[in-house]
Amino acid sequence: GQGSLAYPGLRTQGNLETLSGPNDATRGLTSLADTFEHVIEELLDEQQVIQPSKENKDADLYSTRVMLSSQVPLEPPLLFLLEEYKNYLDAANMSMRVRRHSDPARRGELSVCDSTSEWVTAAEKKTAVDMSGATVTVLEKVPVPKGQLKQYFYETKCSSKGYAKEGCRGIDKRYWNSQCRTTQSFVRALTMDNKKRVG
């Protein structure tokens, strides 16, 4: 059927209620898979529209890796997953039709360096350096009208197993030295400076 507006800027292309037979069901599931991919691509296109310009550097600080919650989040952040998917598509640089059949797991692809990701709190790292170079205290708990929420960070770091000590995959060790290292990045988070200002 004709698409309907589910969210601003997102169009659905089919539903299971319009199906009548077993062959239609198979086509419907394929249609739903296509719709899901289409929705993800539209979300990513929307994100590109609001990409920061040189005049709006504050938008660079938007983070997909920080969450306020009363308990440890069970899943990676949705925007982080969308970002990973977008990076994969950009790197592959393929047409839509080829993308559907290009899951890296199917082709046996491996990352250059093994990594692990998990949610952590400020209990593990109480201080940080802000973009102006000042040391700030990272708030572990944030007061809200009905109690407190913890500030969680989705941290990705090199795996202690695997190739971290032996070098990176795909590098010819006869001619090149390589090393997998965890790097630091800026994220938008709630902190307190030495004058007790929270921001």
From Swiss-Prot:
Glycans are attached at residue 93. GO terms for biological process: cell surface receptor protein tyrosine kinase signaling pathway; modulation of chemical synaptic transmission; negative regulation of neuron apoptotic process; nerve development; nerve growth factor signaling pathway; neuron projection morphogenesis. Residues 1-100 form a propeptide. It is found in: Secreted. InterPro entries: Brain-der_neurotrophic_factor (IPR020430), Cystine-knot_cytokine (IPR029034), Nerve_growth_factor-like (IPR020408), Nerve_growth_factor-rel (IPR002072), Nerve_growth_factor_CS (IPR019846). GO terms for cellular component: axon; dendrite; extracellular space; synaptic vesicle. SUPFAM superfamilies: Cystine-knot cytokines (SSF57501). Residues 12-23 have a biased composition (Polar residues). The keyword Lyase does not apply. Promotes the survival of neuronal populations that are all located either in the central nervous system or directly connected to it. Belongs to the NGF-beta family. This is Neurotrophic factor BDNF precursor form. The gene is BDNF.
